[in-house]
Design a protein with these regions (language model features):
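Terminal alpha-helical segments
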Residues: 1-113
Length: 113
């Protein structure tokens, strides 16, 4: 059922050079417990890149790659959310753009799987 996605997330977590071992442990535990929002927060704390956090944030643990592609195709809907974050100054315009770029990059990765 989410086999391939779980492996990808595991690989991302294992291969990332983390700044904080505690945040890493918390991110992994939260992901395993299904608390994806907390997993993302902890992943950012552990120094994950925008692309890696996108993978966690959108937690599309799908039964098939085709389903994943369809779901990730909707990442373009993030643009209004990113705009809101920019206006609230929760994140810089550059960070918001990196998140959007990461979603496009991840779509390409999925297409090649």
């Amino acid at each position: 059922m989410g086999f391939h996605t779980n492996i990808s997330v595991g690989a991302v977590i294992q291969n990332n050079k983390l700044r904080s071992q505690q945040s890493y442990s918390d991110a992994l535990r939260a992901f395993q417990e299904g608390d994806y929002n907390m997993s993302v927060i902890k992943a950012y704390g552990a120094g994950f890149s925008a692309a890696e956090a996108i993978l966690l944030a959108h937690n599309y643990i799908a039964p098939s790659k085709r389903d994943m592609l369809t779901r990730f195709g909707h990442l373009r809907l993030m643009e209004p959310v990113m705009e809101k974050y920019r206006k609230m100054e929760v994140m810089s315009e550059e960070e918001a753009q990196r998140v959007l770029d990461a979603s496009e990059w991840f779509m390409e990765v999925l297409k090649r799987m």
